[in-house]
């Protein structure tokens, strides 16, 4: 279990989790408040 925690704290895993969270957050913001520059018909 100790090795698994060390693996989860490595830079690529942390970066992947952070970018996934950021992308999901941006997608949800754009779903509720669409960008006015994009015309959705």
From Swiss-Prot:
It is found in: Plastid, Chloroplast thylakoid membrane. Pfam families: PSI_PsaJ (PF01701). The chain crosses the membrane at residues 7-27. The gene is psaJ. This is Photosystem I reaction center subunit IX. Keywords: Chloroplast, Membrane, Photosynthesis, Photosystem I, Plastid, Thylakoid, Transmembrane, Transmembrane helix. One of its GO terms (biological process) is photosynthesis. May help in the organization of the PsaE and PsaF subunits.
